[in-house]
Amino acid sequence: MSSAHRQSPGEQDGSPTPPAYISLDRGDIPATFVPRGTADGRGDRSRSERTDSKRDQRVSNDADDADFFHHVPVMAAEIVSLFATVPSGYVLDATLGGGGHAELLLEAYPSLSILGIDRDASALEAASRRLGRFGNRFTAVHSRFDHLRTAMNTARISEISGALFDLGVSSPQLDRAERGFSYRNDAPLDMRMDVSQPWSGADVVNGYTEDQLIRVLFENGDERFAPRIARAIIANRPIESTTELAGIIVAAIPAAVRRTGGHPAKRSFQAIRIEVNRELEILPDALDEAISATVIGGRVAVLSYHSGEDRIVKERFRSAETGDCVCPPNLPCVCGALRTVRLVRRIAKTPTTDEIAGNRRAASARLRVVEKIEQDVIGNLDETTEPR
């Protein structure tokens, strides 16, 4: 069976080795976001630069509270089960967070190790403390997931037995008021997953044109009142805080609509957060890289919580499954396309009603999984390995 395991110092001399935590401070990984100029639709960033030091000071205490990042992993049983058949070696947790899924996998499968990456340094610190008991079976690298190959090189790992992406913002990030992700708490308009990046929610809200704001709200939040909200934001700038922004959004939405469908600012906050962190922009390359790095028999699993995320996951998995075949769907492939994965499930799996009752943030979760296979021409393999 193929192995994706690297030899650690502890394996060489028999002594226990603490978990490795590789920080961006070493300059190993170019994961800091550099915003584009106004010609690319991202507005002026000087406002963010003036307030970075204050925001960073508020967030710097996050790593002191490792317990804060403990949360209930979504679809935990399903995640553990789907990695039961992968070869021994390293599984990449591309969105490590507090390490909940990683901990379950390490406990369930002694043959697996975890390479955890996350752009949130506070989460990495917390996960490193939580998973320290696993010694050299756990390594953490501060990185965005579209830099996963660089992270693997830094950790001296050439291939992986699988990968897990748990997309979106985590519960601890939402609950930490000063991070600025939530419309329920008063805080600066931050919304950065990596607080070292200069680009923040304030830059989007106060720097984008009306057309740019409409695009963000439509594309990232499916917000049907995007034009009204964008005009209200422009009229009330500068906007300093999350509660100020939430109030402006609520006032811009018709009263009859505000009474149903959850908090009126939810979609807009989600849309701005996605824009700040380039979440949809960097996802396709990350998925392609994860599939490429995975050994035969390994699996790539993605938990998404937003229709835009799920569309991208479905499209990239479909592309790998079909080899980007251009032949008519009802005719044999003659273009020479080679498939590299098979879908473990053709339809996304969703949480059980019991799980949703116990963890409301799991309600929108969608799980999609592919398994790496030997390259083969289209039509030579079964389409799925599990029932629909």
List each language-model region with its residue ranges.
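S-adenosyl-L-methionine-dependent methyltransferase catalytic core, i.e., the SAM/SAH-binding region
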Residues: 2-388
